[in-house]
Amino acid sequence: ARQSSDRRHLAGFEDQAVYLDLAEPESFPAALKDCRYLLHVAADYRLWVPNEAAMRKVNIDGSIALLRAAQHAGVERSIYTSSVAALGLTDDGSPADETTLILPAHHVGAYKRSKYDAEQAVRRLAQEQDIVIVNPSTPIGPGDVKPTPTGQMVLDAARGKMPAFVDTGLNVAHVDDVAAGHLLALTQGRSGEGYILGGEDLMLRDLLALVAELSGRAAPKLRLPLAPLMPLAWAMERIAERTGKTPLMTPDILRMAKKKMFFSTHKARTELGYAPRPARQAVADALI
């Protein structure tokens, strides 16, 4: 963890914690000393950033430097946490998998671009060291102390702060299943291979309805068309560039919503023994 990070999720493990910052390669050797395995889970996960170069420095340069440092330190195997954001999408909305064709148009926004470029660099590294790649979808569940953008959406919906939705879809995974998938990749995964750690495909309206049901609120019923929102999103982004405050929506977020991010976990199930639970459980645990 970084020295500046919120470490509430490490309660009870403080004596085992080591400190590392992807933007500070000089912190790597001490953190990797006597380390047999590395699970590189960290990333700059934001849907909007005022400075894309800073995100790329962490997600790409920092990741490659860390994996090279792990090799130098004698680490036997590394697990690199990529994202489904780095994968291709289908034109018809059917579930994509690890072999789906990747097109530049799929990588909308700084985060997706950085994760795609990082994964490609990691795949090249995997030709010379033992690295397994995992691609989590949308983890939801307990312990999201920051919270992540997805966790914030669930909290906002539970508080009645999302009266409307756009017509899009996503794959929801319980965060504990994603964690278990990392350990399965460590013991069962093939070096150089990638594995989607997903869960259940849901339309956004159905996810919000599930959050509403479990939190005792009415589900949002207003569906907003994407095209009329684009000028508003553009204006919000211009304001954010001046203030530095994260906008409610951006043109890139709306462009991403045009594609359903549905994914198959068949490869992880068959090769790793991955067994995700229903989205209902993930949402219920996120609301505890």
Features from the language model and the residues they span:
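Mid/C-terminal beta-alpha module of Rossmann-like enzyme folds, strongest
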Residues: G181-L248, T265, R280-I288
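Conserved beta-loop-beta element that borders a ligand/cofactor-binding pocket
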Residues: S82, Q120-P142
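NAD(P)H-binding glycine-rich loop region in Rossmannoid oxidoreductase-like domains
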Residues: S4-D61, A69
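Conserved Rossmann-fold NAD(P)-dependent oxidoreductase catalytic core, especially the SDR/UDP-sugar
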Residues: V58-A110
